[in-house]
Amino acid sequence: VLAESWEVSPDSTVWTIRLHQGVPFHHGYGELTAHDFIFSMENSVEKGTSRSPKLLKRHFFPEGGGMTVVDDHTFQVDTVVPAWSLPWDVATGMDNYMGTGVISKKYYDEQGEEKAGYTKAVGTGPWRSIKHTVGGTWRFEAVENHWRKTPNFTELHYIEISEESTRLANFLAGKLDTATFNLESIAQIEKDCQK
């Protein structure tokens, strides 16, 4: 939850968002600021890197509206029309459904688009990216003394398995702790787990 608080204008179109202070980026890339937040949203819209760039643009950069920095930890969003979900979207770093997160502008400027995007992402979460193979796996390590809470286990591996049957076989064989499945696979999982 990156947003500490927010206020909305009486007509529900101008939102003032205050970010938590002292939220560090991974790998020593400074503290999260309103500048990083706006840069991340603008970059996702410009590059089309979010899952829903059109929705992101309509939500944060509508014609006649947009985002502005008030101070290092405060920014405003003029949505032109009421946007009831805006506090939730900001508080969760937009990753919940729009598929974009807040990244360090400093890291992006130093390392370039490819590395800063997904090769070695630098964020603020309880897991720090340590290795990524395109189309394969992500390896994360727990961030000690994370500003919210240190995770209960030291490493997290995210494996991209696009084929449902392969994902299901790995899960049933105990090679995956959790996975997403189509509804059609649930009966097979329930049947095999009852054995």
What does each model-identified segment do?
Residues 91-151, 155, 165:
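Gly/Pro-rich hinge or "lid" segments in bacterial periplasmic/extracellular proteins
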Residues 115, 143-189:
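Ligand-site clamp/hinge motif
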Residues 1-3, 10-14, 62, 70-74, ...:
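Extracytoplasmic
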Residues 3-5, 64-67, 126-129, 195:
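A structural signal for short loop-to-beta-strand junctions that line the ligand-binding cleft
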Residues 22-24, 44, 82-85, 134-136, ...:
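Solvent-exposed loop/turn segments at secondary-structure junctions
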